[in-house]
Amino acid sequence: MVGIPGVGKSTLLTTMVEILKNHKKNVIVINYGSLMFDVATKNGLKDRDDLRKLSVSEQQRLQKLAAETIATHNEEIVIIDTHAFINSPEGYYPGLPEHVLKIIKPSNFVSVSAKPEEIYNRRMKDDTRNRDKITLANI
């Protein structure tokens, strides 16, 4: 499941998982950025939101390691929560580039969208993350 930051992916996933579990499905949600951060902390990264500030080559390396971990999961339903694009110092980079898709081999792809005003308001209220400031016009 992909979407831009603040679109509501994680909130939607909470409801989806509850419904799936009520239907006796074995489901796991993996936040791709959190998995990448787990690996990056071993190399000294302190803030999850600094992942996007790494070079694209380092992001690619972390994405590959995270994808290899995801590919080992054997739950009936594995849902990946990630961003469609990451705003990096080298420009926008896909959250699920081709080299990752070849490893995880997804069977479905869901893109979440919302009105820019809703996204902006969610981002402004979220004090749990160290997000880059953005204007409504840029969303």
What are these regions (language model features)?
Residues 124-139:
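Small-molecule kinase domains that catalyze NTP-dependent phosphoryl transfer to phosphate-bearing small molecules
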